[in-house]
């Protein structure tokens, strides 16, 4: 022990009592420990040791596992022995104790420093013969290394008993040679040709792979002999001289069917077979070739492709195509002449791109659709003679993209791809091009996500280019709970798209260049009753929402019809610059509703009876565009028909703002508007609207605050009224009306209604900037009326009651003789005197006007 250390001392075990060689201020500053090279135990006073005297302690525990007893002083730097306070007596003894505590702390710190690894006079760290423990493995070349690190490194070296060994020759002299020793010196020698050493040297070269025995093609592997269970066979390439489709095969016991890709059965073998060692099924494993745009040799790969698909299904492996994902502009694909069935497959990685020629294609038939031949089917459900078994759809599939193209471009009737699946995720797109029939059909499917669906040159008068709907069956199972990002139908013929999925969402629909050749497509009541008898786009689905919808047909084509079914359906926007629109009722009880944002239509709109609609705005851009509504619940925020010959015919609902050339309304509330020619039948309420001409022929029509007619008005019907309105032209009254707070800048003519038992006309707070011309049966009630002249002609029956009225001109009319007793209140003018008279119970009395 270094004698310069004063506060730490260690004794060998063996005794029980040990001296304390240093002074201390308190026993709690003395620590007694049992120590060894790799362990230390701090003992407790009284229970594990005790003081024999002030300078001696006695151990009370065994020392097994330890070889030393350590006694050290550890004076507290925070717990003061002497605590000074203001006003206390300062004694020398207290000062000495306080100074001594500080001295002890400094002395102990010096001893700890002396126990640490210090620099010697040369600047090197001196461990003073002690071990350095808990050292990490070295990283840099100059780092210290542990014994374990060094020992492990030596275990991987070639060791000799001699103290020194000469270095190996340069690597340039050792290439292709094996190591040998001559005279104690390492040398390189060439192995004997054909020897095991020679083989090992050759195999160790970069080119050694070429020396390993292997099958040169899948067909060559079938002729292998001498194989035993457990052997591994290396296949260079699927085809002789090729570079793809190779791999390793394990020889297994048993019988199997050779599938031409993953299972190989040697010729004549019945008890062994070779199975490819892999965790996926690649198209190249089966020698499946692709072609560019279908212009190559067109080798039919349908058999190989179906084998690969079947292997992926049975082994539950992903099918890897190795074809980059493409949309409908397909360039490279696998040519097939027979339809393929991917039912039950779980994963397709890469784009499954198929090229077909419908003139040669032997398509697959799906249950319930005997006349449609499909290039690809995916039928994850149970079926019977009628079609699908309700509620049986499964799936849980994952696809990158599936693209099918008819290289003959509608060369013969055919169909692209049909999916019946549930819980499926498509990462890319489902696309079809060039089919005279369905392109992409998703029927009886649920709970799936598809970012993109596209068809080009698909559809006909009987089948939809894209069809998302129910699968046929005794109880049709409708598609529902689908999330579809985008649907695009380009260059469709007649039927472009039907989307009838329930409780689903479609983010965007883009229809372009549709060619409509027929208007005879009414194969269902949904279409037959839509007002047009045909539809090229059909959007429906209980509780389904659509984002933006756009349809732009071929110029010169028969105007296509876009039909939207009010089945609690939501559409953000409809842009149909050259299309007609049908807003149709749903065959549900109670009737559903359509909620739409903005609708822009270049053609006409028909709203069928029972179609409950709530629409933010409708704009009709055609010169003679016409909206015809048979629904009593057509509710529109803004309805604008901008054409000079545009018209609106509606039987009910609410319109926030109506702008059109001509409107014929029944049961409609219009809050504001601008109309050239307005005809009101029954039960209309019009306010804050300007009409250039007005014709009222029905009953219970109410012209309210802010209504204005800038031209002539013909007012017929009964139980009609006008209040707080302006007639800027002449008014022809055909039937009794009630006017309150009305300004008429023209003559008012009332001819009376000889067929009506009630023929009252009421003027209250009315200003007629013209003449009031009365003829025929009438009963006039005027209160606070102003007019220029009142002319009465051939009034055979009736009366006139006037109160607070002003005639700036005068009253003139036929003379009523005593032999012609009129009803009480009748009024006339004595042409001889010019004094107007009114008939009372006392006879004719002069009439005084205020």
From Swiss-Prot:
Comment text on domains: The N-terminus anchors the RBP to the virion. The central part and C-terminus probably binds and degrades the host exopolysaccharides.
Coiled-coil ranges (or none): none
Entry keyword annotation includes RNA-binding: no
Protein name: Depolymerase, capsule KN4-specific
InterPro entries: Phage_T7_tail_fibre-like_N (IPR005604)
Family of the protein in this entry: In the N-terminal section; belongs to the Teseptimavirus fiber family.
Function (record text): Functions as a receptor binding protein (RBP) and probably mediates the attachment to the host capsular exopolysaccharides. Displays a depolymerase activity that specifically degrades the KN4-type polysaccharides of Klebsiella pneumoniae capsule, which allows the phage to reach the host cell membrane and bind the entry receptor.
Keyword terms of this UniProt record: Degradation of host capsule during virus entry, Degradation of host cell envelope components during virus entry, Host-virus interaction, Viral attachment to host adhesion receptor, Viral attachment to host cell, Viral tail protein, Virion, Virus entry into host cell
Gene Ontology annotations of biological process type: adhesion receptor-mediated virion attachment to host cell; symbiont entry into host cell via disruption of host cell envelope; symbiont entry into host cell via disruption of host cell glycocalyx
Entry's transmembrane regions: none
Annotated compartments: Virion
Record has Isomerase as a keyword: no
Subunit structure: Homotrimer.
Predominant subcellular localization, coarse grouping: virion
Gene Ontology CC: one annotated term: virus tail
């Amino acid at each position: 022990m270094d004698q310069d250390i004063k506060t730490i001392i260690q004794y060998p075990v063996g005794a029980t009592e040990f001296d304390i060689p240093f002074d201390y201020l308190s026993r709690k500053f003395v620590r007694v420990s049992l120590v060894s090279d790799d362990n230390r135990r701090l003992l407790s006073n009284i229970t594990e040791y005790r003081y024999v005297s002030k300078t001696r302690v006695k151990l009370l525990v065994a020392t097994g596992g330890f070889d030393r007893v350590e006694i050290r002083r550890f004076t507290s730097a925070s717990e003061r022995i002497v605590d000074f306070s203001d006003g206390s007596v300062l004694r020398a003894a207290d000062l000495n104790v306080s100074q001594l505590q500080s001295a002890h702390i400094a002395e102990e710190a010096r001893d700890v420093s002396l126990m640490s690894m210090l620099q010697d006079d040369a600047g090197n760290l001196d461990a003073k013969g002690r071990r350095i423990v808990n050292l990490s493995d070295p990283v840099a070349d100059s780092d210290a290394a542990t014994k374990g690190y060094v020992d492990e490194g030596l275990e991987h070296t070639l060791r000799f008993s001699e103290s020194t060994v000469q270095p190996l020759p340069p690597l340039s002299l050792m290439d292709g040679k094996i190591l040998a020793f001559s005279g104690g010196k390492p040398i390189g020698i060439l192995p004997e040709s054909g020897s095991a050493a020679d083989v090992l040297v050759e195999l160790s070269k970069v080119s050694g792979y070429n020396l390993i025995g292997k099958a040169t093609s899948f067909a060559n592997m079938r002729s292998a002999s001498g194989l035993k269970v457990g052997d591994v066979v290396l296949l260079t390439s699927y085809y002789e001289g090729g570079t793809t489709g190779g791999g390793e095969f394990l020889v297994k016991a048993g019988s199997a069917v050779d599938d031409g890709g993953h299972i190989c059965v040697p010729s004549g073998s019945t008890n062994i077979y070779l199975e490819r060692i892999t965790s996926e099924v690649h198209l190249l494993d089966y020698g499946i070739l692709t072609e560019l745009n279908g212009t190559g040799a067109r080798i039919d790969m349908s058999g190989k492709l179906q084998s690969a698909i079947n292997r992926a299904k049975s082994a539950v492996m992903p099918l890897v195509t190795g074809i980059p994902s493409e949309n409908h502009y397909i360039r490279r694909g696998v040519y097939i002449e027979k339809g393929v069935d991917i039912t039950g497959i779980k994963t397709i990685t890469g784009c499954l791109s198929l090229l077909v020629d419908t003139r040669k294609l032997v398509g697959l038939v799906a249950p319930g659709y005997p006349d449609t031949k499909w290039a690809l089917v995916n039928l994850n459900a149970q079926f019977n003679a009628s079609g699908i078994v309700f509620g049986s759809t499964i799936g849980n599939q994952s696809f990158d993209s599936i693209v099918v193209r008819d290289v003959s471009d509608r060369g013969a009737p055919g169909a692209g791809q049909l999916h019946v699946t549930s819980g499926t995720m498509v990462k890319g797109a489902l696309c079809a091009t060039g089919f005279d029939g369905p392109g992409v059909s998703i029927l009886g499917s649920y709970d799936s996500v598809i970012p993109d669906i596209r068809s080009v040159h698909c559809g006909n008068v009987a089948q939809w280019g894209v069809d998302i709907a129910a699968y046929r069956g005794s109880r049709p199972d409708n598609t529902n709970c689908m999330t579809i990002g985008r649907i695009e139908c380009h260059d469709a013929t007649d039927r472009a798209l039907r989307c009838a999925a329930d409780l689903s969402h479609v983010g965007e629909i883009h229809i372009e260049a549709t060619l409509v050749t027929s208007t005879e497509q009414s194969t269902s009541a949904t279409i037959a009753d839509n007002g047009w008898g045909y539809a090229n786009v059909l959007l429906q689905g209980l509780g389904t929402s659509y984002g933006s919808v756009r349809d732009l047909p071929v110029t010169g084509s028969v105007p296509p019809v876009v039909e939207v079914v009010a089945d609690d359906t939501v559409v953000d926007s409809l842009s149909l610059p050259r299309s007609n629109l049908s807003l149709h009722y749903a065959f549900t009880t109670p009737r559903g509703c359509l909620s739409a944002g903005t609708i822009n239509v270049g053609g006409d709109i028909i709203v069928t009876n029972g179609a409950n609609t709530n629409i933010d705005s409708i704009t009709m851009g055609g010169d003679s565009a016409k909206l015809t509504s048979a629904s009593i619940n057509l509710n529109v925020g803004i309805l604008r028909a901008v054409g000079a010959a545009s018209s609106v015919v509606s039987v009910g609902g609410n319109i926030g703002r109506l702008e059109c050339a001509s409107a014929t309304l029944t049961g409609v509330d219009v809050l504001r508007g601008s109309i050239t020619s307005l005809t009101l039948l029954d039960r209309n309420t019009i306010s804050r609207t300007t009409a250039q001409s007005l014709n009222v022929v029905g009953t219970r029509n109410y012209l309210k605050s802010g209504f204005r007619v800038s031209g002539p008005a013909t007012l017929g019907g009964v139980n009609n009224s006008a209040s707080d309105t302006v007639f800027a032209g002449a008014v022809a009254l055909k039937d009794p009306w009630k006017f309150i707070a009305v300004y008429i800048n023209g003559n008012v003519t009332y001819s009376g209604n000889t067929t009506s038992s009630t023929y009252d006309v009421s003027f209250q707070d009315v200003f007629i900037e013209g003449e009031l011309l009365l003829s025929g049966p009438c009963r006039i009630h005027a209160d606070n009326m102003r007019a220029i002249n009142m002319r009465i002609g051939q009034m055979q029956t009736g009366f006139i009651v006037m109160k607070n009225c002003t005639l700036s001109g005068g009253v003139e009319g036929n003379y009523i003789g005593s032999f012609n007793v009129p009803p009480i209140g009748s009024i006339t003018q004595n042409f001889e005197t010019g004094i107007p008279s009114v008939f009372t119970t006392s006879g004719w009395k002069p009439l005084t006007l205020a």
